[in-house]
Amino acid sequence: MVSEMTPTRRALAAVLGGRVDYVPPANPLAQTTTELMAICNASWPKAHFDSKMMADLAAASYEVCGIEAARPQFDISLEAEVLGCKLDWDKPDRPPVTGPAYTNPEDVTWPDKLEETGRIPVVLGAIDELRKRYDGMLPIIPLLTAPFTVAGHIAGVENMARWTKTDPEKAHAFIDAATDFVVAYGKLQAAYGAHILFLADPSASSSLISAETYREFVLPAHRRLAKEISCPQILHICGDSSKLLPYIKQSGIDCFSFDTVPVWYCRQVIGNDMSILGSLDVIDLMPNGTPEQVYNRTRECILQGTDIVGTACGVSYGTPLENLRAYVRACKETPIPRYDDVEDLIRQIGVGIGRNMKENVLGGMQE
């Protein structure tokens, strides 16, 4: 057992495949519940434009519930906005892009002083505020929208999907331009004090693209991020990414955050090539389940081999704080399974599933 670690050291060790004292509840998905926003006096859309309010809201889940991460930047549209897209601020929580900004990839440009452009200074200011406030003790894991999603925003999602079939050269050019921008912004986040970058690429979901499309168009961009940004990274892709896993593990990114893939299956396919983060359901379990159910599901994730426990996506506004606290408590109270290799882990999972059925989900919170 490793001696007691700080949240930052624990999260970094887990992301990079090292030893930890317990599986960290370092959730980089959005935790902006109504209760947390009221407690820290944050509101939409102000939290998108004020560095201190952004920092307060990013850290609220740690201060109130013990979740060991702070994630500034709350929307995946900021990058597209900087590149010229308009946003729908009638939906102020996570404003969507209203439409594409470019038809020609050669026209994609951004200002030289990126740190002074759009809402980027707000995010960088929040990172700096959090770094000073916690003296490096709390991992700062800002959102960074990944290239394929950014390309879809600035060129049109339907256009990008069509071009991967009809004009692959144009699709590649837009992705390359988006990657150049994301690398530049990611380097700024790291320079201002981010410990880990959270790469969100929802448009790379297998519900939208095939595994072959991921391999040809998305994987090269992910490899560039891993190579060119000197900061640990977590990649998140929504939906059922099971068919993408054989390629995702070739990306060079440190950790994969998954949605609906079973934990044991993700561990089996990924092996030890990456750390994995997942996966508490946010549709029913987190908003509607009991703390005991959340606790038990967290234990299952740990026993099935996840390196970090987090939610499958951002939690809904009505998620009870007691459910967030139960998830943290389960991480701290569940011993880490020790296995010499992944194959042995999978065999043990089979035994564990049978035992769960017999003992009514691991004996609940009495263990």
From Swiss-Prot:
EC top class, as a word: transferase
Classification via Pfam families: URO-D (PF01208)
Entry-linked CDD domains: Mta_CmuA_like
Alphabetical list of Gene3D superfamilies matching this protein: 3.20.20.210
Coiled-coil blocks: none
Origin: domain of life: Archaea
Database matches in InterPro entries: Methanogen_methyltrans (IPR052024), Mtase_MtaA_CmuA (IPR006360), UROD/MetE-like_sf (IPR038071), Uroporphyrinogen_deCOase (IPR000257)
Listed cofactors: Zn(2+)
Cofactor: how and how many bound: Binds 1 zinc ion per subunit.
Molecular function GO labels: metal ion binding; methylthiol:coenzyme M methyltransferase activity; uroporphyrinogen decarboxylase activity
Keywords: Metal-binding, Methanogenesis, Methyltransferase, Transferase, Zinc
BP GO terms, sorted: methanogenesis; methylation; one-carbon metabolic process; porphyrin-containing compound biosynthetic process
Disulfide bonds, paired cysteine numbers: none
EC number of the protein: 2.1.1.251
Lipid metabolism among keywords: no
Entry-linked NCBIfam families: mtaA_cmuA, PRK06252.1
Complex formation: Homodimer.
Purpose of the protein: Methyltransferase involved in methanogenesis from methylated-thiols. Catalyzes two successive steps: mediates the transfer of a methyl group from the substrate to the cobalt cofactor of a methylated-thiol-specific corrinoid protein (MtsB), and the subsequent transfer of the methyl group from the corrinoid protein to coenzyme M.
Family designation: Belongs to the uroporphyrinogen decarboxylase family.
Protein name: Methylated-thiol--coenzyme M methyltransferase
Highest classification ranks of the organism: Archaea, Methanobacteriati, Methanobacteriota, Stenosarchaea group, Methanomicrobia
